[in-house]
């Protein structure tokens, strides 16, 4: 009856609310919960917050009925004395006050229950300190809670906030449905299931403890508030404030965007209390604009607004949402935007000096001590304002105009931020010290401020700010926002567990660990790593004394926390703290320097500061001046008197001065008398005066007194709405109207300042204290009654519609206890007041159990509130969310909170209730070492022998942790009952286990105690047995201690007689236990006690094997030193080395091998250490063993080798190591590699490498075998992720095979392989290119052209492709011409030019195609070497096969020259094919390397200017202009040196070029030209002289225009050589007159071409092909004829690009000069520079010395064309004959240079370069040149290739070939005696000359050189190219010849040969050439390419 009536009274008829039954865990049955949740949810707004009843106060804020506990309250409380009496009592006390619930409340005003939750939470968390039960009871009020500091949530935000809360931020997690934070966690999980947010939050919580799913389903409010509320006390969302904006915000922010643990926690203190710990939403809210509505208000609306903000926070850059730490919102009402800071520089100076001092006892921090109002907070705020956090000052300083009476000129900007200096605001005289001193002091202040990284204000009226968890969390949040510590922020973002560690939940559970591991250790590490500045940092803490007001029953205050932690602070992290003088004792443990602000008499600076402030106030206000001046005058005397009087009264208090001046300024004080009697004498009188003025009558004060009472009693700032609701909660009749309330609040606005979050704080802590307490003798007027405020707040919480969250529940309990409204009733009613209070709280909320078990109340319990909760029906056996869902008693036992344990036991908590791990409270207490709690529990008959799930009893737990006293107590306990009950576990077993546990952990005292136990009643069971193993771990004491390395315990045990050989249960003896762990000191101890160093275990393993297996090097070395045998084997035949290898311990392997271990020992399975190491997979061990003689091909009994094992185990690093060491890939290897794509790739790559190696060595057949084998082994399937890699690998293999097949003349297969590659990789331009080469080799020019067009589409910038394309186009034309009767040589040249130029690879192309090209380059070399020109004699001569090294860049130039589009204007590369072609070509060394065939081709073909000289050289192919069209410019390959001579000299450049041997073109053509252009006597070119060939060619038969070989009209042909000087030209001296004549026209032409080429020096060399006499007196024609072949070739070969492209210097050929200007037979000819102009001649002569010249001289004209090209200035040798095969490279080095220049491209550029020389040579070899010459001219392989472009001026390869044979002979025979002398086109020397270096004359040498040239020049293509056309008559020999020609490129290429090439030789050559050309290609020689394919 009583309960019901009371309930009806309180609830206003609503009896739905029930308290949780005290029994079992849940406060209400799950179904009911569910239903209520559902019902609430149904009406909750978004976020699950109920819009109706959720609101703390709905429009009607009737107080919800107090729920009755389900289990009858009577049971717990006992039957009430009399229902009626109790009911009457409550009615009397409460009834009148409560009356009916007030139903109407202004929507905005509704006060949420959340506030209550927060308060409650705080209360729970904190013990009620004597000063304030509130404090202790409430950790932090939720924002919405009446006490909450958080701004109320706006209506829209409400819903969201709530949901946010529901979602539970990490903090909120704390508050779960279950009471308390722990409950929060639990609920949190449930909610998590329901909300994604929750999910995130759960993670964090999870880390802390198990979260129970929130039972938020009960009601929307439940869900919302609950989760929120309960989860976070701080959230107190349930109270209107927090939930609405904060929770929502926090949740939304934290939950949605970040993981739970990252979710921002409401930074409210309450957060940890029963409200959600993680919901610091209120803090967030504070950050946001304050919302007026209470959290409880309709959530949806509130949440809406809040949500948007939250979203902003979440997604906006604001702060990366991932940082979940949220700073507390601090507002300091006493600091306003108008506050002025004056003076006190001395304080900063002293602080700075102390912090920088070297005295470690005081440099860690400073304590600023002063009385209230003395400026401590202002000093801290000043530093904050000037610090990196200065922007947050707006949050600290209050904007409120009422903040202080003085708001006259409120400058919006914080003065603190401006940091006015004392002297700035005061008359200069008033400031202490000189300006310099002041400046230094101000600098000190700014320096200190710059070091501030965090700050914290403790405010007694905002409990959250006084709690340690919030302090830690706030400091961490500010640290990570400090710009100096960005590295710390990044680390928090990188390591989410650190954020979790700093979550409010973690801070509540263990603030010290959180601070140490989340702040101090990371900062220390960052400092060591120099990631943060190496300077001091400062943390500011204001008002340590304020925090004492909220001191918890258990746990630290901020001061005690700092005292314990300061020892862990790094020396560079300083603290500046402030404390009130009266409480300075609390800081005595801090080793800080102290600065006193109130010792006015001792410190003159304080007086000066006060004086400055007074002066500032007087001067800054005319009102003050008027009020204090006597007779309207303000004289110094008056001022001094007033100043002195005020300073005396203030005693140093700035607050007193400020308030007094405010009164004077406003006219409330008028100082007209000199006695100043009206001035208040103390701060108390100032407040009294202010109140008297504000409230003149008692009734006026009575109207506002309830508001002040509520504000004083609240734990945190409340919004106006909350205060309004709280006041109305106490009215029975007629509620206060909102307008009336607002009016009253306005009257208080100067005392209760509105913060940004719309909550109200007292203007100053001193005013709050003045309202509560007065000193003796002071007037008691205006004293407030905090009890009344507590009562109103308690009623307000009771009337909340929704269920209170944990924080609010604890706040409610706090207020109920503080209100104490039943005081004195117990006697009257017969019911104890505590029972009545329990009934009250049980009727007011359902979450008692959850509040009791909230995190904050678990870790910082409020004993009184907890008792109240238990009285109200909280379940004392409620399972928490921590310690494996341990019951509350377990947690309190673990924490050592004796009072709480006693309280729980008093109310009958289950003493043996266990957590999920099976531990009981006794186990927790024993493990933690709390003897008092162990005793308490044992008195309650806790089971001593209870075993947890690990089989450990409390005694073992105590022994494991070294708690001797607990061990002693437990052993003395009575185990009999327990033993009888269980019948299994006996005390003796426990003691034995305890012995092992203590021994393993090294607790010698416990071991000794247990061993010395008395033998009770003669029963040995009591005493532990030293040699027995226990029943738990199976260890003996000695094996346990030895295994854990406990040396002292081992000594003790051995002294006590422990057996050294006594094994444990597994049979392991102590020696093995310790060896396994590597404790060599204990090994030593055991050995000294008789252990055998070589003893073996059951498997035959010795300690040495064990140590080696485990990798303990120190132990291994120690055992070896102690005589351990290194050769012993275990039962498997494994030695110590085998074990070390099997486990991959390199250091041990090294040690054992050094000590003589056998590396070839085989075990019983035949496995050597290397096998085992390969099995393990440590490549370093494998490498070491192989280096030390291990057999790499050893086969074990199963047929496996180390490589096979490594493959089988997929140890790729070992596979690679073994393959590098030469391991063979056998069938087993392939078998093991099956389905291991990574291994297959390695093996196939190895095969490909081997193939590449053979290929480069010229062993094409072997290379092809390797590639074929690799393809055969290619896996059919199972590529998986490696599909792309395998495809690329296969494409490479196919392309390589294609190359090899082409080299092997198997063009069909080559084409087929390239096609397969295309099928695999349709977009592969390399494949198109390879197939085109194959088709070209088989003379399918049209098809090759198609492929090349495709390739050029795919890779438009690849010069190799471009060059080959041009050549193939030229060849196509030539083909057409060939089909017709051999046209005059001129025609082919036309075609040639196109072919000639191969596009020069661009770097990018090079890399992609490089392999191909390089290989081709190599191929060409190989081919050059391998394939001899079929021409019989020629090969040998041409063979001065110096295989011209691939054309060096010089060659390229030549190529360029020839390739110049002018084609017709072919600059003559005067490179002697012969020895000049040698590497030196040197002398000439046009940058282009010796031209490889490729180069030659390019020479013929104009090559892009960018092409290297070699390429230019390559452009040599010129198609001779039609016979009739001499005047026309045709790109024609430079005629072979012989042919060229005449052409060049006589014919216009283009035409002369056209002279190239047309296919039919034969020497005749040259002769013709020669005749035409012969000049009477051509002076010998210096080249010829230099060539050391005195051979002046006797007049060659001048006109032997044989066959179609037409010499161009004797127009001077301009030979453009890239070489700056016309050395080349000069070397072939052409009579100036003749040349001059022709030169001009040519020059003009060439110049234009040159311009195109961009060759700076390119010189037009006139080759006076018009009959002239060479210096020797031969008719110029002859010379021309000889020269024409080369020169023309060269000339034609020059491209614009070629000429200009490379300065001679550019070509690698620095060597150009180095080589003696030997003019190989061909060389001289080719170089026979036709200097058309005197300049050219001069240059050439001068350049002879110069590299350019030397090229000219050395190289046969034909050979050198490439070389010459590089040097535009150098004229090309007139002789074209040899040139045909060769490219002239300007530099003798050209070959080498080419290689150097484009090693990567070797294939491309080098080949091209080489090609020029080679090409002519090839052409010759193929067409008509002697085999030798082709060789010289082209890459060895080139000769085989028939050139479409006139080679050496002969287009028809046949002609060339024919020429070659003759030339071959002749070339050697004829030498250009003078520079004029032209080498016969065929002379091998000339041909080879293009190569930069002169290979040995022998064919082999030639081959070598060719190879080199090819490699360097990369242009072998032309040889190949030409050979098909008219391979040398000899056929394959032609190739050789070309090669030889290239080889000849050495200058060495037997000068003799060249010399022999006398005129007669030349004549013969010409004749032969003409014949050959007429004949056409005699033998189809497949054009061979230089090794480098790039040279087409």
Swiss-Prot record:
Belongs to the TANC family. Pfam families: Ank_2, TPR_8. This is Protein TANC2. The modification Asymmetric dimethylarginine is found at residues 1565, 1578. ANK repeats lie at residues 846-878, 884-913, 917-946, 950-979, 990-1019, 1033-1062, 1066-1095, 1099-1128, 1132-1161, 1165-1194, 1198-1227. Glycans are attached at residue 1930. Transmembrane segments: none annotated. Residues 1380-1390 have a biased composition (Pro residues). The modification Phosphoserine is found at residues 169, 238, 294, 400, 1444, 1460, 1532, 1547, 1581, 1724, 1826, 1829. Scaffolding protein in the dendritic spines which acts as immobile postsynaptic posts able to recruit KIF1A-driven dense core vesicles to dendritic spines. GO terms for biological process: dense core granule cytoskeletal transport; in utero embryonic development; regulation of dendritic spine development; regulation of dendritic spine morphogenesis. It comes from the Eukaryota. The lineage of its organism: Eukaryota, Metazoa, Chordata, Craniata, Vertebrata. One of its GO terms (cellular component) is postsynaptic density, intracellular component. Residues 419-428, 1471-1500, 1794-1805 have a biased composition (Polar residues).
């Amino acid at each position: 009856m009583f309960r019901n009536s009371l309930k009806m009274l309180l609830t206003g008829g609503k009896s739905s609310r029930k308290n949780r039954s005290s029994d079992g865990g849940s406060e209400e049955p799950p179904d009911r919960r569910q239903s209520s949740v559902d019902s609430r949810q149904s009406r909750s707004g978004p976020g699950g917050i109920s819009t109706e009843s959720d609101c703390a106060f709905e429009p009607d804020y009737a107080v919800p009925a107090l729920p009755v506990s389900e289990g009858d309250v009577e049971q717990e409380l006992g039957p009430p004395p009399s229902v009626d009496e109790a009911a009457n009592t409550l009615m009397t006390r409460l009834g009148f006050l409560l009356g009916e619930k007030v139903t109407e409340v202004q929507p905005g005003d509704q006060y949420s229950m959340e506030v209550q939750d927060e308060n409650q939470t705080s209360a729970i968390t904190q013990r009620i300190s004597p000063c304030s039960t509130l404090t202790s009871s409430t950790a932090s009020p939720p924002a919405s809670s009446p006490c909450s500091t958080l701004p109320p949530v706006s209506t829209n935000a409400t819903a969201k906030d709530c949901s946010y809360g529901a979602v539970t931020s990490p903090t909120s997690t704390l508050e779960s449905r279950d009471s308390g934070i722990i409950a929060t966690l639990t609920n949190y999980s449930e909610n998590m299931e329901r909300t994604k947010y929750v999910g995130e939050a759960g993670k964090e919580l999870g880390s802390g403890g198990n979260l129970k799913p929130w039972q938020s389903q009960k009601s929307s409010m439940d869900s919302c508030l609950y989760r929120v509320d309960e989860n976070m006390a701080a959230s107190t969302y349930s109270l209107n404030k927090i939930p609405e904006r904060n929770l929502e915000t926090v949740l939304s922010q934290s939950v949605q965007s970040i993981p739970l643990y990252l979710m921002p926690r409401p930074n409210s203190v309450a957060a940890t209390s029963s409200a959600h710990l993680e919901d610091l939403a209120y803090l967030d809210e504070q950050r946001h604009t304050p919302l007026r509505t209470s959290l409880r208000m309709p959530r949806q609306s509130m949440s809406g607004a809040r949500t948007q903000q939250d979203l902003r926070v979440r997604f906006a850059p604001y702060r990366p949402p991932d940082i979940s730490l949220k700073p507390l919102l601090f507002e300091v009402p006493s600091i306003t935007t108008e506050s002025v800071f004056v003076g006190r520089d001395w304080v900063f100076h002293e602080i700075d000096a102390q912090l920088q001092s070297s005295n470690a006892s005081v440099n860690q921090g400073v304590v600023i001590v002063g009385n209230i109002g003395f400026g401590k907070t202002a000093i801290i705020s000043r530093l904050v304002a000037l610090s990196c956090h200065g922007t947050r000052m707006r949050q600290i300083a209050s904007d409120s105009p009422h903040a202080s009476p003085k708001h006259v000129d409120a400058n919006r900007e914080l003065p603190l931020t401006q940091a006015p200096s004392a002297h700035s605001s005061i008359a200069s005289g008033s400031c202490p010290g000189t300006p310099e001193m002041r400046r230094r002091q101000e600098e000190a202040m700014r320096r200190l401020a710059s070091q501030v990284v965090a700050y914290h204000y403790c405010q007694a009226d905002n409990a959250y700010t006084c709690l340690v968890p919030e302090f830690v969390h706030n400091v961490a949040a500010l640290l990570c926002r400090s710009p100096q510590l960005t590295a710390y922020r990044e680390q928090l973002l990188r390591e989410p567990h650190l954020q979790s560690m700093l979550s409010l939940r973690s801070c509540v559970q263990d603030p010290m660990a959180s601070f140490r591991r989340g702040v101090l250790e990371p900062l220390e590490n960052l400092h060591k790593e120099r990631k943060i500045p190496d300077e001091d940092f400062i943390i500011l803490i204001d008002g340590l004394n304020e925090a004492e007001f909220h001191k918890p029953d258990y746990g630290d205050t901020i001061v005690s926390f700092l005292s314990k932690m300061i020892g862990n602070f790094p020396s560079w992290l300083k603290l500046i703290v402030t404390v009130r003088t009266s409480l300075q004792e609390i800081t005595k443990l801090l080793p800080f320097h102290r600065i006193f602000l109130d010792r006015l008499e001792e410190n003159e600076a304080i007086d000066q500061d006060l004086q400055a402030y007074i002066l500032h106030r007087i001067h800054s206000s005319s009102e003050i001046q008027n009020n204090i001046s006597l007779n309207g005058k303000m004289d110094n005397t008056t001022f001094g008197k007033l100043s002195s009087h005020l300073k005396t009264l203030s005693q140093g208090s700035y607050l007193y001065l400020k308030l007094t001046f405010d009164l004077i300024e406003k006219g409330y004080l008028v100082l007209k008398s000199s006695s100043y009697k009206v001035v208040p004498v103390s701060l108390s009188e100032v407040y009294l005066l202010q109140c008297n003025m504000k409230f003149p009558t008692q009734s006026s004060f009575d109207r506002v007194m309830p508001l002040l009472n509520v504000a004083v009693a609240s734990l945190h700032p409340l919004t106006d709405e909350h205060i309004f609701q709280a006041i109305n909660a106490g009215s029975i009749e007629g509620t206060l109207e909102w307008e009336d309330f607002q009016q009253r609040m306005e009257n208080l606005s100067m005392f209760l300042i509105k913060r940004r979050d719309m909550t109200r704080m007292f203007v100053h802590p001193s005013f709050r204290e003045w309202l509560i307490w007065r000193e003796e003798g002071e007037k008691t007027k205006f004293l407030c009654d905090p009890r009344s405020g507590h009562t109103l707040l308690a009623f307000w919480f009771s009337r909340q519609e929704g269920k209170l969250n944990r924080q609010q529940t604890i706040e409610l309990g706090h207020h109920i206890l503080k209100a104490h409204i039943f005081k004195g009733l117990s006697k009257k009613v017969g019911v104890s007041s505590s029972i009545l209070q329990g009934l009250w709280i049980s009727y007011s909320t359902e979450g008692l159990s959850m509040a009791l078990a909230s995190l904050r109340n678990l870790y910082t319990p409020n004993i009184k509130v907890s008792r109240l909760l238990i009285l109200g029906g909280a379940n004392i056996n409620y399972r928490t969310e921590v310690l494996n869902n341990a019951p509350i008693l377990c947690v309190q036992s673990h924490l050592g909170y004796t009072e709480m344990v006693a309280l729980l036991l008093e109310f009958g908590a289950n003493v043996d209730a266990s957590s999920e791990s099976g531990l009981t409270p006794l186990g927790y207490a024993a493990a933690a070492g709390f003897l008092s709690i162990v005793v308490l529990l044992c008195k309650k008959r806790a089971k001593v022998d209870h075993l947890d799930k690990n089989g450990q009893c409390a005694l073992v737990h105590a022994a494991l942790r070294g708690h001797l006293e607990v061990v002693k107590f437990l052993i003395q306990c009575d185990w009999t009952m327990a033993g009888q009950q269980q019948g299994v576990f006996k005390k003796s077993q426990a003691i034995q286990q305890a012995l092992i546990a203590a021994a393993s952990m090294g607790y010698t005292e416990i071991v000794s105690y247990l061993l010395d136990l008395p033998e009770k009643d003669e029963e040995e069971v009591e005493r532990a047995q030293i040699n027995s193993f226990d029943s738990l771990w199976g260890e003996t004491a000695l094996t346990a201690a030895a295994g854990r390395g406990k040396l002292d315990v081992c000594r003790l045990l051995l002294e006590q007689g422990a057996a050294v050989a006594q094994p444990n249960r597994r049979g392991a003896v102590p020696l093995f236990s310790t060896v396994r762990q590597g404790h060599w000191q204990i090994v030593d101890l055991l050995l000294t006690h008789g252990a055998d160093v070589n003893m073996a275990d059951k498997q035959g393993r010795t300690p040495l094997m064990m140590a080696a297996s485990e990798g303990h090097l120190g132990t291994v070395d120690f055992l070896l030193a102690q005589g351990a045998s290194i050769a012993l084997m275990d039962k498997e035949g494994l030695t110590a080395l085998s074990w070390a290898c099997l486990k991959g311990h390199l250091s041990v392997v090294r040690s054992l091998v050094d000590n003589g271990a056998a590396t070839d020992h085989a075990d019983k399975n035949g496995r050597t250490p290397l096998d085992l190491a390969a099995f393990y997979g440590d490549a370093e061990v494998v490498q070491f063993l192989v280096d030390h003689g291990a057999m790499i091909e050893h086969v074990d009994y199963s047929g496996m080798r180390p490589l096979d094992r490594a493959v089988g185990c997929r140890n790729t690093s070992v596979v690679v190591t073994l393959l590098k060491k030469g391991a063979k890939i056998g069938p087993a290897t392939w078998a093991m590699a099956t389905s291991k794509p990574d291994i297959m790739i390695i093996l196939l790559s190895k095969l490909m490498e081997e193939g590449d190696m053979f290929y480069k060595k010229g062993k094409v057949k072997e290379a092809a075998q390797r590639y074929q084998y690799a393809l055969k082994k290619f896996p059919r399937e199972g590529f998986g992720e490696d599909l792309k890699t395998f495809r690329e690998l296969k494409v490479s293999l196919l392309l390589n095979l294609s190359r090899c097949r082409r080299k092997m003349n198997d063009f069909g297969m080559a084409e087929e392989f390239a096609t397969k590659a295309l099928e695999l990789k349709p977009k592969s331009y390399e494949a198109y290119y390879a197939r085109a080469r194959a088709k070209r080799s088989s003379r399918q020019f049209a098809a090759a052209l198609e492929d090349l067009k495709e390739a050029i589409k795919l890779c438009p910038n690849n010069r190799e492709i471009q060059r080959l394309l041009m050549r193939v186009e030229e060849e196509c034309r030539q083909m057409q011409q060939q089909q017709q009767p051999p046209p005059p040589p001129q025609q082919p040249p036309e075609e040639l030019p196109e072919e000639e130029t191969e596009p020069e690879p661009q770097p990018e192309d090079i890399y992609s195609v490089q392999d191909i090209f390089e290989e081709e380059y190599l191929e060409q070399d190989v081919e050059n070497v391998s394939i001899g020109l079929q021409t019989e004699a020629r090969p040998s001569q041409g063979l001065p096969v110096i295989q011209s090294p691939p054309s060096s860049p010089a060659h390229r130039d030549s190529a360029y020259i020839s390739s110049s589009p002018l084609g017709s204007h072919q600059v003559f590369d005067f490179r002697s094919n012969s020895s000049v072609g040698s590497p030196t070509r040197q002398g000439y060394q046009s940058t282009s390397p010796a031209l490889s065939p490729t180069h030659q081709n390019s020479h013929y073909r104009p090559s892009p200017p960018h092409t290297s000289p070699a390429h230019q050289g390559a452009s040599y192919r010129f198609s001779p202009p039609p016979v009739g069209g001499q005047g026309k410019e045709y790109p024609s390959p430079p005629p072979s040196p012989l042919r060229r001579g005449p052409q060049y000299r006589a014919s216009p450049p283009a035409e002369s070029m056209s002279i190239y041997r047309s296919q039919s073109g034969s020497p005749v053509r040259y002769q013709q030209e020669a005749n035409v252009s012969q000049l009477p006597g051509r002076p010998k070119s210096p080249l010829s002289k230099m060539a050391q060939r005195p051979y002046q060619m006797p007049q060659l038969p001048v006109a032997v225009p044989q066959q179609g070989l037409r010499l161009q009209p004797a127009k001077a042909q301009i030979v453009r050589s890239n070489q700056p000087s016309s050395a080349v030209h000069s070397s072939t001296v052409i009579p100036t007159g003749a040349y001059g004549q022709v030169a001009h026209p040519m020059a003009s032409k060439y110049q234009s071409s040159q311009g195109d080429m961009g060759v700076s020096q390119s010189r037009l060399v006139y080759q006076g092909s018009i009959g002239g006499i060479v210096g020797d007196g031969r008719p110029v024609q002859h010379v021309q004829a000889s020269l024409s072949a080369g020169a023309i070739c060269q000339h034609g070969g020059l491209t614009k690009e070629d000429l200009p492209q490379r300065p001679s210097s550019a070509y690698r050929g620095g060597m150009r000069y180095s080589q003696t200007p030997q003019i190989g037979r061909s060389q001289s000819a080719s170089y026979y520079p036709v200097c058309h102009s005197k300049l050219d001649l001069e240059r050439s002569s001068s350049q002879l010395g110069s590299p350019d010249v030397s090229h000219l001289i050395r190289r046969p004209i034909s050979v050198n064309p490439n070389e010459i090209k590089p040097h535009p200035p150098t004229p090309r040798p007139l002789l074209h004959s040899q040139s045909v095969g060769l490219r002239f490279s300007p530099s003798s080095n050209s070959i080498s240079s080419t290689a150097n220049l484009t090693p990567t491209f070797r294939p491309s550029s080098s080949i091209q370069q080489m090609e020029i020389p080679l090409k002519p040579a090839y052409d010759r070899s193929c067409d008509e040149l002697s085999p030798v010459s082709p060789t010289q001219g082209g890459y060895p392989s080139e000769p085989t290739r028939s050139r479409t472009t006139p080679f050496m001026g002969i287009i028809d390869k046949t002609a060339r070939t024919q020429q070659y044979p003759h030339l071959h002979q002749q070339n050697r025979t004829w030498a250009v005696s003078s520079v004029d002398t032209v080498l016969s086109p065929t002379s091998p020397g000339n041909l080879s000359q293009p190569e930069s270096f002169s290979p040995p004359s022998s064919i082999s040498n030639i081959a070598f050189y060719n190879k080199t040239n090819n490699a360097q020049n990369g242009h072998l293509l032309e040889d190949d190219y030409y050979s098909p056309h008219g391979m040398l008559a000899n056929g394959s020999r032609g190739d050789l010849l070309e090669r030889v020609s290239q080889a000849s490129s050495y200058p060495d290429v037997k000068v003799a040969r060249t010399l022999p090439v006398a005129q007669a030789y030349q004549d013969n050559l010409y004749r032969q050439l003409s014949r050959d050309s007429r004949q056409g290609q005699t033998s189809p020689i497949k054009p061979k390419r230089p090794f480098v394919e790039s040279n087409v």
